[in-house]
Amino acid sequence: MQRQLVDFKNVTIQIDSQKYFNDVNFSIKKGEFVFLIGKTGSGKSSLLKSIYGEKKIIEGDAFISDFNLCKLKNDKIPVLRRRIGIIFQDFKLLNDRNVYNNLVFVLRSTGWKNKELIKERIIECLAKVHITKLKNKLTSQLSGGEIQKVVICRALLNNPEIIIADEPTGNLDPMSSIEIMEILKEININGNTILVATHDFELLKKYGNRFMKCTNGNIEFIEKKNLKLDNIYK
């Protein structure tokens, strides 16, 4: 039986001193590819942030792997985040460095010291995302699609148990969006659990099998056969 990698039971999340997502229940199994949907302002980003410890869970039980988010102390949050690959909406890349040195910075910041092991891991992850040829380019010289591939590569560096992506194709053209989704699909096939927040209906139809919808401070599950445009915007 597949274990539950993410398990939220009767969870209430605090956002700006207010309760939100009251009595939420959902789980994600190891190896799943799950889409998080809902209209703008429905709380998708906040729910994702609760998974990696940025938003506070004040009631219920919430586990990510062997981490109890309800009892997680501040000094353990960096340890949790090394187990999670996060694809931010605003990229957070260092524009004065090339792609390779951006990735070196991440590994050194998370405790890697051996130069050869760092090089080996970076080369491996660049190949997984098909951007080996970009390693010496400044991030400021990259296209939007290339930047997003670098961000995915960065998320893979510490071999995370789950990758969380918040609107990873939001600012990309349709062709680049498909390239990004194909990369995430390939990563998932190779064993990584993926959770993607998006409102792109065409991508949902093409790539999705399991859908969680944020609505009225709660989560509901939608089967693919019932997926409609109204599910996303209402």
Predicted region positions:
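Helix-to-loop junction immediately C-terminal to a conserved catalytic motif
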Residues: 52
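Conserved ABC ATPase "signature" region
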Residues: 67-68, 104, 116-134
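Conserved ABC transporter NBD signature motif
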Residues: 60-68
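Helix N-cap at the start of a conserved alpha-helix in ABC-type nucleotide-binding domains
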Residues: 174-176
